[in-house]
Amino acid sequence: MIRFITIPDFADYQVILKLMEDYVNKVISDHEPEIIYLVEHSEVYTAGTNYKQEELLNYGDIPVIYTGRGGKFTFHGPGQRVIYPILNLDSPNRHKDLKLYIKMLEEWIINSLNYFGIKAYIIKDKVGIWVKVRKDEFAKIAAIGVRVRKWVTYHGVAINISTDLSKFSGIIPCGLEDSLVTSLNQLGIHVEMSEFDKIIQTEFNKIFK
């Protein structure tokens, strides 16, 4: 059984990044067990390896951190559950297939949202998890950005629970102009983070056996 570790309070992004990187090295060199960090960050914009500087619009006093994960700009902050799985895809019960791993992440989050009555989708050529908010119009509810070192995964998924969505106006989220963002709260689903975490853990064990 993989251990989920909940980081208390609002965590500094750079502190968690170092925590992840250190643990990835331990998995690679010392064969430490797989774990998953559950984090709620203090406000920060992060840029993935495919970012364009013009996609950073007006960040004000929110720090901007350039990371090694895939993807472009996104926002992390209170009310958002960020999930960092550190999994060894080279272990006997896994597959050395990054596309399959991302597909499994998507299925995991979609199933978790479905528990709360939210029908979520993946959209061709658009990274992340989406929900229909109006006819033929979708909003992103979860962002995905991962990295792999010697087949050990890190970075992960950010799901908007009760996030202040106005903060996304400081960037072009994931490089998608005119794309909408949403949250469970905005969809009328009010859930405590601890309750959401229980479902995340249950659904994880169904997908990542």
From Swiss-Prot:
Site (described: Lowers pKa of active site Cys): 140
Other known facts: In the reaction, the free carboxyl group of octanoic acid is attached via an amide linkage to the epsilon-amino group of a specific lysine residue of lipoyl domains of lipoate-dependent enzymes.
Family: Belongs to the LipB family.
Keyword entries, A-Z: Acyltransferase, Cytoplasm, Transferase
Record flagged with keyword Transferase: yes
Name recorded for this polypeptide: Octanoyltransferase
Annotated Gene Ontology cellular component terms: cytoplasm
A Gene Ontology biological process term: protein modification process
Reactions accelerated catalytically: octanoyl-[ACP] + L-lysyl-[protein] = N(6)-octanoyl-L-lysyl-[protein] + holo-[ACP] + H(+)
Matching InterPro entries: aa-tRNA-synth_II/BPL/LPL (IPR045864), BPL_LPL_catalytic (IPR004143), Octanoyltransferase (IPR000544), Octanoyltransferase_CS (IPR020605)
Single GO MF descriptor: lipoyl(octanoyl) transferase activity
Pathway noted in the entry: Protein modification; protein lipoylation via endogenous pathway; protein N(6)-(lipoyl)lysine from octanoyl-[acyl-carrier-protein]: step 1/2
